[in-house]
Amino acid sequence: MAKEVSKVVKLQVRGGAANPSPPVGPALGAAGVNIMEFCKQFNGRTQDKQGKVLPVAITVYKDKSFDFVIKTPPAAVQLMEAAKTKKGSGEPNRKKVASVSWDQVKAIAEDKMQDLNAFTVESAMKMVAGTARSMGITVKGDAPF
């Protein structure tokens, strides 16, 4: 018989850097999870992604056991890395802060494909391009589709 789910906690934590301080500690403490056990497991599974922001969904069961799924870094973070900028624009419709190529958008879309609800790479590229547009990052060139 399957375990009964008590709570699902969603966080964004840097790879290999989970520790009991906020935001991880309070969120997991309120759910009744052994915080140090989560930190050890998370840091062990994300050693190869040191420093990258990773969304994680932690499923907490009634018996206080847990499991978690690590997703790919957010598209916004990947776009900022590709554009070599620290943050998006405060006024994306007026002030553009950087630009990326369609090849970079395609690489990000292929990386994010498992987490997006898109069936084709082209539709995933459109989602990533929309994220870029809302951040004040322009996509250079004509769309390849």
Swiss-Prot record:
Belongs to the universal ribosomal protein uL11 family. Keywords: Methylation, Ribonucleoprotein, Ribosomal protein, RNA-binding, rRNA-binding. Forms part of the ribosomal stalk which helps the ribosome interact with GTP-bound translation factors. It comes from the Bacteria. Pfam families: Ribosomal_L11, Ribosomal_L11_N. NCBIfam families: L11_bact. HAMAP family: Ribosomal_uL11. GO terms for cellular component: cytosolic large ribosomal subunit. It comes from Christiangramia forsetii (strain DSM 17595 / CGMCC 1.15422 / KT0803) (Gramella forsetii). This is Large ribosomal subunit protein uL11. Part of the ribosomal stalk of the 50S ribosomal subunit. Interacts with L10 and the large rRNA to form the base of the stalk. L10 forms an elongated spine to which L12 dimers bind in a sequential fashion forming a multimeric L10(L12)X complex.
